[in-house]
């Protein structure tokens, strides 16, 4: 069974987070490229604002939370590989999307807008407010089945501590492209497209 993270793995979310940061903070005058460079160096939004000589307004986090899954902002996300390639992979392999979202309805609408409506029944949506990690979900729901988790965040490497789970992380999504996993069964891949094109028997 293959599980794919969504944000950052199948879709590029930088434009959405850039727009949200600008709108929620009121900070303008930065390009998308500047935001990405600074965000990778300083993951905390407060530090990003400080890099521009500003502080975040008191209502920043309230605004950001209301914007994160607003369809108007979700519309900024772009597929990293064509919808046809994703759908074909899911059709030919046992797959699910495993994502963290507070609004499953908005997520379903986003899938449809991106041309992935055929995957609506192949999604597991975890609510981040429940504090359940993807590793916990896999441990509880697949105690013996062999699982492959494909993601883009260093934190997802913890799932590789489960004996039955292999983790593949897309290098372009890592904050540090040179980061080396400290656990076995965790591997770095160059692109999601290359992974989907690879011989699945070798995974």
Predicted feature locations:
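N-terminal helical cap/lid subdomain that shapes the substrate entry/recognition surface
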Residues: 1-82
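Short beta->alpha linker loops
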Residues: 78-81, 102, 129, 152
């Amino acid at each position: 069974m293959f599980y794919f993270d969504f944000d950052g793995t199948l879709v590029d979310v930088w434009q959405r987070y850039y727009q949200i940061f600008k709108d929620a903070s009121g900070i303008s005058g930065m390009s998308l490229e500047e935001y990405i460079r600074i965000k990778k160096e300083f993951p905390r939004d407060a530090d990003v604002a400080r890099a521009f000589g500003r502080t975040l307004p008191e209502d920043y986090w309230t605004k950001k939370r209301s914007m994160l899954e607003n369809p108007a902002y979700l519309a900024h996300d772009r597929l990293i590989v064509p919808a046809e390639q994703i759908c074909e992979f899911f059709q030919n392999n046992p797959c699910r999307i495993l994502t963290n979202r507070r609004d499953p309805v908005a997520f379903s609408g986003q899938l449809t807008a991106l041309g992935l409506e055929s995957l609506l029944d192949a999604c597991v949506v975890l609510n981040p407010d429940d504090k359940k990690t993807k590793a916990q979900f896999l441990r509880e729901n697949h105690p013996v089945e062999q699982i492959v988790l494909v993601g883009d965040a260093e934190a997802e490497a913890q799932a590789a501590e489960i004996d039955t789970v292999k983790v593949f992380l897309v290098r372009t999504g890592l904050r540090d492209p040179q980061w080396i996993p400290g656990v076995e069964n965790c591997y770095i891949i160059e692109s999601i497209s290359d992974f989907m094109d690879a011989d699945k028997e070798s995974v």
